[in-house]
Amino acid sequence: MATQALEDITERLLIRSQEAILQLDLWIQRQQRSSICQTTDQESLDKLSQQYNQYMSQLNSLYVRSESVRDKLSKEQQRRLITEDNEHQRIEDLVREFQDITLRLNELATVPNEAPNDSPQSQSTRSSLGSFQPRPLKIIERQRLCMVTPSKPPKKSVGFNPINEVDCPSKTNSLPCSPKKQPARNRTLRAAKSHDTGLNKSKKPSSSDTYESFFKNRQRLSLTFFDEMDDEDFDSDQDTIILPNISTPPHVGVTAKGAEFEPLRRYNSHESILSNKPAPSKSLNLGSFSASFFRPSNPTFGTSISNVQVNCHPTVAATMAPSRNGPRISSSKALLSSFIARSDTHTVKENNTNLKHASFMDKFNSSLSTISESFQSKRGRKNKGMNEERISNHNVAQEQKNNMDISVSIEELQDALNTELLF
């Protein structure tokens, strides 16, 4: 589009320039005619000639430039036409070659169909049989190829001539009268199992080397497996016995005067220690210490709003009298019934303390009794009168009844009555 517009513009310029030149020529001719008819001054004629020459030069330059532009445009147009013609010609040539190739392929495809249907056996002659060559076997062909073109290059062997021994005059063996030197015997190196065995002395032995040396010295590793153990002895919990602790507190020895303890049974996994009620101590004998050294007050323990004040007076009943075979132990129901039968109640304040305090008081009282006994044994010789008073006070403390107020709920008492205590 741009080239066509340029061509149109150049053609118009040429036409206009030619028209201007023609108009100037006509105007000059008119002026000449008029000048002939009318007399004019020489100066005016000179001016007119200068203007004429100027206009003519401008018109000539414009004409020349327009012609050059026209020539360039024409050349480009011709070249473009030539290139387009060449491209079209190339495309036509390619199409013709493609058509020729397709025709030849079609001819080749139709050749076997036009062949006669006679079998090759009927057409075979002596010349055809003579020209037949059997195909060689693959093994023979492969062997021939290997011989012609070996896969591996031949090994290059380099031979060295033996070095003659040079006689050295500094040695005695080199003298002409001395015997010849015998050749040294060839020594072979011992084949090592590893490339680094015993060669690198500066290398530190690794941990694997120490393990190997450890097992090499012993030649084997014996392991014992416990798969043949008989686990039937450990199936029942009845046979498992927990012996009493050696370091028993001193207050436990009071109950040892009666019958012997039964061995404790270990609980099974499905049982719970918390399901059983904690068994109280067998006896509440608090007279093992002197009344002058420590006299406990009335401890109270509050559990709930609906508490019942129970006055605990430990007394020896007829059921606790020793029998012929041994000391007789009262049952839990008899003990609890004796606790409930007491009607002396006192109102006390609620105190949320644990029952562990009672066991702590028992241990504390027993420790005080042992301290008082040791104190009496040391100072028995000096103060005999004081020792007799302490013994009398001790007897009085045994005869005196220790009152302990324990506040428990009715539900706990009923549960305790229903549970059987094992001593």
From Swiss-Prot:
Residue numbers of Phosphoserine PTMs: 119, 178, 269
Positions of modified residues (N-acetylalanine): 2
GO biological process: one example: vacuole inheritance
Residue stretches of biased makeup (Polar residues): 116-131, 199-211
Protein name, UniProt field: vacuole-related protein 17
Protein family per UniProt: Belongs to the VAC17 family.
Localization terms from the record: Vacuole membrane
Residues that bear Phosphothreonine: 149, 248
Function: Vacuole-specific MYO2 receptor required for vacuole inheritance. Binds simultaneously to MYO2 and to VAC8, a vacuolar membrane protein, forming a transport complex which moves the attached vacuole membrane along actin cables into the bud. Once the vacuole arrives in the bud, VAC17 is degraded, depositing the vacuole in its correct location.
Oligomeric form and interacting partners: Interacts with MYO2 and VAC8. Interacts with ATG18.
Protein topology in the membrane: Peripheral membrane protein
Residue numbers spanned by region MYO2-binding: 110-170
Disulphide bridges, residue numbers: none
